[in-house]
């Protein structure tokens, strides 16, 4: 069947980077050149620093694509890139001093960024996802410290727990094998009783993705 993966969490943690790498590694290689080009156009942009780049919820790709998991298990997969929960210090949430208005698939009119993050995460998880992935960070890249992400991370995790969908937390880090990252993952596991893995979203390998999916699906 189709597996829809809702990618949620605070803004500026690498959600779009995760989706881009995921598609490049497991979906694109199995497609024709024309199809690859079409899907590449749909991949989210990743930003750096403090600026929020994802301002609307997107289904990527538009149609579910078949991928092979492990030995021979074929599933059709589609990822959902959601507007993240706001964190202190991130810019791009206001325009001309007012809260930025963003488009969502659920309302005809644009709604304030903060609302879009909350409603978007709820809808993505409730209505569209088979499994969830919360992407957060240990603060080792970008310019925002780890503490700035805790509150938004908690909102995302609690939202997923409410929906009772299987999910996993990824701690995106420049150095996923170093103590700081591992300690962050450990704290999240203890605090929320969830599985948390450390990864570098920008350098994900195919086996990382297999490991992530196996942890959530089985």
Say what each PLM segment does.
Residues 1-108, 126:
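Conserved G1/Walker A P-loop phosphate-binding module
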Residues 80-83, 136-139, 173:
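Fold-independent oxyanion-binding glycine-rich loops
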Residues 148-154:
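Charged helix-capping and loop-helix junction motifs
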